[in-house]
Amino acid sequence: MAEALKQYWYLAVALVAVAIFTVWVVKKAAEAAGRTRAEREAQMKKLEYESGVRKEFAELSEEKLRSADKKRAFDGVAMNIQRYLEKQSNMNAAFAELPDAKKQIYALYYLFDDSQKGLSEFFKCNSVPLTPEALKAVESLFPRDAAEAFAGEYRAYDPDDETASLIPAETEKNDEKYAQAMKNFDFYNAAVEFIIKNLNDFC
């Protein structure tokens, strides 16, 4: 046997290589299966959460909004607007007919989500009609520095504004300014207070 291995050493090397490769493939397959399972579970939790908050906040009252978890309340209101728009044959036309308060809450929903990686991500992902409505909401609800940073990027990303240019250094500066201003700002509480103030538009 030893003599055979000496004579055909390359076969032994090949067998070892195949064994190592097989272990590697099995390990990668297990990791991929784990990721897929985790992603599927996360998606199921997300869908369950969305369904739950839509039902919970299908009907609104000041008492319900004040006593509720503010994130759930905001998400529920925004997701019900989203569900309504999805059912329309022309979403842009339906959005244009919404009360201003609903437009702004819907825009804020996307702003809060898309800006987690930076304010500029919101502008990269969205345009008219969401961005003007987000601007209105930000100017009335957010801290001054956040509103200034938002307005700066709004102008920079506006193709019709010839007085502003998209300069990467300025974008980074505004992203940082916005992030700092929002650190201690209770976004969900401010948004829910806005909904309560304009409750007739949501009922």
Language-model segment annotations:
Residues 30-57:
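Short juxtamembrane segments adjacent to a transmembrane helix
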Residues 31, 52-106, 112, 123, ...:
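Extended, alpha-helix-rich binding/interface surfaces that flank or overlap catalytic cores
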Residues 113-118:
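Boundary/linker elements of alpha-helical solenoid repeat scaffolds
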Residues 1-38:
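N-terminal signal-anchor transmembrane alpha helix of single-pass membrane proteins
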